């Protein structure tokens, strides 16, 4: 098939899709979504059989998905909608999450489901979950969706209901050392890593925290530095401590 990859940035998932599709013999082109009018122009010039959007930050123009079958990758299970799916999953402590291939539609992540995969959630940074579990699930779901399209199926399974979760407000990422448990602090950091970071006050100075892991023995005053080792510092929490790389 003649496939157009439409993406905000040619990120790891977009690159994986490009390589996998090319190796399977598909003719693949990449268009960066920088402006709706440029997207429409690119589609009209390329005349794709299928458009796949692995990573976007805004809606696909209606003029595109009304004329061309357009599949969107959403890093959440069917029924989940919104721009910060993995962030919310980590913050809420979900035990299982997923990724699905949807048809583009008027409302965010509300299109028909062509395929989906689920995976257990690790205690890990958002970027790690995205590049491993979410990416592997997305590739598997993509092949299932393509098989259905090649069989002549015209649409996926309609979503009966869904919950839209808005962008995670910066206040929900801010660490309160005296209220948040170590687990809650880690969730905020993991959900905000690699961006935008979890805002925290450490000994009177504000920092955006990344790359943290729990300490099993040391304890100290919440928000205070209690130890240093190599390129990391240990910060006390209300019920323990954690290490933060510097």
Across the structure, where does each feature detected by a protein language model lie?
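Donor/substrate-binding cores of folate-linked one-carbon enzymes
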Residues: 2-4, 17, 56-164, 171
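An anion-binding loop in the catalytic cleft
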Residues: 5-7, 19, 178-246
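Structural motif
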Residues: 6-10, 32-34, 54-55
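Short N-terminal binding/cap micro-motifs at the start of the first secondary-structure element
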Residues: 11-16
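A short beta-strand-loop structural module common to alpha/beta enzyme folds
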Residues: 27-38
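Short amphipathic alpha-helix with an adjacent loop that forms part of the alpha/beta core around
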Residues: 39-46
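Short, structured active-site "lid" loops
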Residues: 46-59
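Acyl-group handling in specialized metabolite and lipid biosynthesis
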Residues: 168-179
């Amino acid at each position: 098939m003649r496939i157009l990859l439409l993406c905000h940035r040619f990120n790891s998932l977009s690159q994986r899709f490009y390589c996998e599709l090319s190796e399977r013999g598909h003719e693949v082109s990449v268009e960066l979504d920088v402006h709706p009018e440029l997207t429409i122009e690119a589609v009209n010039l390329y005349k794709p059989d299928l458009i796949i959007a692995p990573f976007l930050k805004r809606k696909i123009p209606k003029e595109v998905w009304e004329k061309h079958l357009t599949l969107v990758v959403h890093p959440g299970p069917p029924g989940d909608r919104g721009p910060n799916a993995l962030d919310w999953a980590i913050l809420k402590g979900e035990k299982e999450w997923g990724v699905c291939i949807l048809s583009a539609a008027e409302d965010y992540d509300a299109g028909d489901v062509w395929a989906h995969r689920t995976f257990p959630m690790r205690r890990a940074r958002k970027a790690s979950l995205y590049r491993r579990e979410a990416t592997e699930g997305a590739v598997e779901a993509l092949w299932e969706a393509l098989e259905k399209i090649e069989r002549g199926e015209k649409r996926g399974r309609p979503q009966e209901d869904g919950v839209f979760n808005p962008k995670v407000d910066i206040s929900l990422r801010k660490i309160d050392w005296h209220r948040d448990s170590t687990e809650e602090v880690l969730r905020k950091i993991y959900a905000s890593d690699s961006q935008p970071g979890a805002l925290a006050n450490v000994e009177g100075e504000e920092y955006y925290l990344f790359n943290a892991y729990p300490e099993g023995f040391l304890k100290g005053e919440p928000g205070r530095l209690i130890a240093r080792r190599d390129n990391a510092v240990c910060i006390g929490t209300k019920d323990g401590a954690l290490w933060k790389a510097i």
